[in-house]
Amino acid sequence: MKVISSIHELRDQLRGQNRTAFVPTMGNLHEGHLSLMRLARQHGDPVVASIFVNRLQFGPNEDFDKYPRTLQDDIEKLQKENVYVLFAPTERDMYPEPQEYRVLPPDDLGGILEGEFRPGFFTGVCTVVTKLMACVQPRVAVFGKKDYQQLMIVRRMCQQLALPVDIIAAETVRDEDGLALSSRNRYLSADERSEAPELAKTLQRIRESVLGGEHDLGKLEEMARTHLAGRGWAPDYISIRRRANLIAPDAAQLEAGEPLVVVAAAKLGATRLIDNLEI
C-alpha cells in the first residue's frame, strides 16, 4: 500500500485507473470502516482510502483538536485490507490557502436534524468530499448508513453536480450489544459505555411500534426523548422521517406504507452519539 499526502502524487499514481473505489474517512479506523473497504472492493478496483480530519466540518466548540488521530495504527489495518493507496494529506495539502469557495447543501436537507444542531457541518462535509472526489476521481465511493443524513446529502450533491461517481451505501456495523461503532465511542467512560446501547434499543422499540401500527409519531418521539432523558441522556433529536427526503411523513404516507427511518442524536455525558434505524 502506498501512503500519499500530495494531491499531485496521488493523481500521478491513479492515472489511467477507471474503476477506482474510494472510501473517505477521518481515521481512527474500526471494524465499521474496514467493512467499507471490503464493500468497496466488491464494486471497484483499486480501492483508495483517505484519512483527513477536516477542520471545516467542526464547529468552534466541537472536538477537532481532541479527535483521535491514529495514523500508524490505521495504516496497518488498511494494509491488511489490501488497500492500494491511502491518501493522507496534511491540512496544508488540502487547504494550501484559505478555502473561500464552499459547497452549500440546500436548507431542506442540510439545515435540518444534524444541520440544525451543527451549523456549517454539512457545508464542511460537502466541500471536502467534493475536493477529495476531484483528487481521487473514483468510479464509486462508499459511505456508511450510520451517518444517514450525510449519505443522502452526498448522494444528492453528486447527482446535482453531475459528478461521475456512484455512491454505495454500507450497512451500520454494531457491537454485540447493539451500539453502532464510532470513533467517538472511545470518549465514553466505562459506565457510559454500559449505558450507550440504550440509544439503539430505543430506536428498535420505535421501529417495532410503527410496524405494529402506531401512527402517532409525535407521541413515540416524545416518549423516546423522555425515556432517554430519564436515564441521563441529553437528546438533541429523535425523529421519524421519510427515507426519500428526511421530511416527516403525513398520515396518507403512513397509511400507504411509506419507507421510514428513525434518526437520533443524543449526548451521554460529554459524548454525542448518533444512530438511526430504517423502518
From Swiss-Prot:
Binding site for (R)-pantoate: 57, 150
UniProt keyword ATP-binding present: yes
Keywords of the record: ATP-binding, Cytoplasm, Ligase, Nucleotide-binding, Pantothenate biosynthesis
GO MF terms held by the record: ATP binding; pantoate-beta-alanine ligase activity
Location in or out of the cell: Cytoplasm
Residues that bind beta-alanine: 57
Top-level taxonomic group: Bacteria
Class of this enzyme: ligase
Catalytic activities: (R)-pantoate + beta-alanine + ATP = (R)-pantothenate + AMP + diphosphate + H(+)
Residues annotated to bind ATP: 26-33, 144-147, 173, 181-184
InterPro entries to which the protein is assigned, alphabetical: Cyt_trans-like (IPR004821), Pantoate_ligase (IPR003721), Pantoate_ligase_C (IPR042176), Rossmann-like_a/b/a_fold (IPR014729)
Keyword Ligase: yes
Major localization class: cytoplasm
Task of the protein: Catalyzes the condensation of pantoate with beta-alanine in an ATP-dependent reaction via a pantoyl-adenylate intermediate.
Further comment: The reaction proceeds by a bi uni uni bi ping pong mechanism.
Protein name as catalogued: Pantothenate synthetase
Native source organism of the sequence: Burkholderia lata (strain ATCC 17760 / DSM 23089 / LMG 22485 / NCIMB 9086 / R18194 / 383)
